[in-house]
Curated annotation (Swiss-Prot):
NCBIfam families: major_cap_HK97 (TIGR01554). It comes from Mycobacterium phage L5 (Mycobacteriophage L5). This is Probable major capsid protein gp17. The keyword tRNA processing does not apply. Disulfide bonds: none annotated. InterPro entries: Phage_capsid, Phage_capsid-like_C. It holds the Pfam family Phage_capsid. Keywords: Capsid protein, Virion. Gene3D superfamilies: hypothetical protein PF0899 domain, Major capsid protein gp5. The lineage of its organism: Viruses, Duplodnaviria, Heunggongvirae, Uroviricota, Caudoviricetes. It comes from the Viruses. One of its GO terms (cellular component) is viral capsid.
């Protein structure tokens, strides 16, 4: 332990919780830049869309993605016949990043007393906030800066009433996803690669069987114990059950998740201050508070995400609508 120049009184040090720290030195050793990347790791882990969508490199001005349209064909010919000509075409999609941000406010005493726990809590809360906002925008278009999202599809099938009449009790969840919904996709030249379902569908899935009498949803053996979602398979397609998919009567989506791309610009940026004045109210009813006057600390976290759904018709909405209850 260091001592003061008089060699008699112990010097507690600038980071000791008993020292009334002020200014930048208050955060020395608390918020290291290398710890910021963990925020993205948590966000990527929690976001269900980011589990299935393709991640692409993203620059500050966006990304132009080339896309091949049309098929190349070949024909059998006889000796001396004119060779057929085939053409293809390339188009591109420009995807722009959008900023997402949040500010955490806590008392300086709390930070000084237990900095490790404060940072851990903040990491979890930031990750959850970012992931939820991203998924809500990508799935349902809620407060979305992105022009495309899954809910824009017009294809729809009910898990509890596959034929939409409420009169055929012999139809099951298997008929809904593996027959009716799949037919909507393949008849339009689309694929079924993955499925997203809300936790609200668990009672529906628990008793569901395939045509061989096996459970329709087979949970992954290697799912993490504390995972924020359940991972498994339906008809050999990777499937996720999570608590923030549903919106109204829509409880899930199945389709070609290769049509989804997302990216992030650089790393996480954060600022720490105890000198600003923040509006802790709303724009309509502001409540401006001086951090310095009230001995508060604010941490601003920002990130830039991009998302694009290339083909909304490659997805089918799964609902819990029952015609007999309408």
């Amino acid at each position: 332990m260091a001592v003061n120049p008089d060699r008699t009184t112990p010097f507690l040090g600038v980071n000791d919780p008993k020292v009334a720290q002020t200014g930048d030195s208050m955060f020395e050793g608390y918020l290291e830049p290398e710890q910021a990347q963990d925020y993205f790791a948590e966000a990527e882990k929690i976001s269900i869309v980011q589990q299935f969508a393709q991640k692409i490199p993203m620059g500050t001005t966006g990304q132009k993605i080339p896309h091949w349209t049309g098929d190349v064909s070949a024909s059998w010919i006889g000796e001396g016949d004119m060779k057929p000509i085939t053409k293809g075409n390339m188009t591109s999609q420009t995807i722009a990043p959008h900023k997402i941000a949040t500010i955490f406010v806590a008392s300086a005493e709390t930070v000084r007393a237990n900095p490790a726990n404060y940072l851990g809590t903040m990491r979890t809360k930031v990750a959850t906030a970012f992931a939820m906002a991203f998924d809500n925008a990508a799935i349902n278009g809620t407060d979305s800066p992105f022009p495309t999202f899954l809910a824009q599809t017009t294809k729809e099938v009910s898990l509890v009433d596959p034929d939409g009449t409420g009169s055929n009790a012999d139809l099951t969840v298997y008929d809904a996803v593996a027959v009716n919904a799949l037919s909507l996709l393949v008849n339009a030249g689309k694929k079924w690669t993955h499925t997203l379902l809300d936790d609200i569908t668990e009672p529906i899935l628990n008793g569901a069987k395939d045509k061989s009498g096996r459970p329709l949803f087979i949970e992954s053996t290697y799912t993490e114990e504390n995972s924020p979602f359940r991972l498994g398979r339906i008809v050999a397609r990777p499937t996720i059950l999570s608590d923030h998919v549903a919106s109204g009567t829509v409880v899930g989506y199945q389709g070609d998740f290769r049509q989804l791309v997302w990216g992030q610009v650089g790393g996480l940026s954060f600022d720490v201050t105890d000198q600003a004045t923040l509006n802790l109210g709303t724009p309509q009813a502001p409540n401006f508070v001086s951090l310095w006057q009230h001995n508060l600390v604010a941490v601003r976290v920002e990130a830039e995400y991009a998302f694009h759904c290339n083909d909304k018709d490659a997805f089918v909405k799964l609902t819990n609508v029952d015609a007999t209850e309408a």
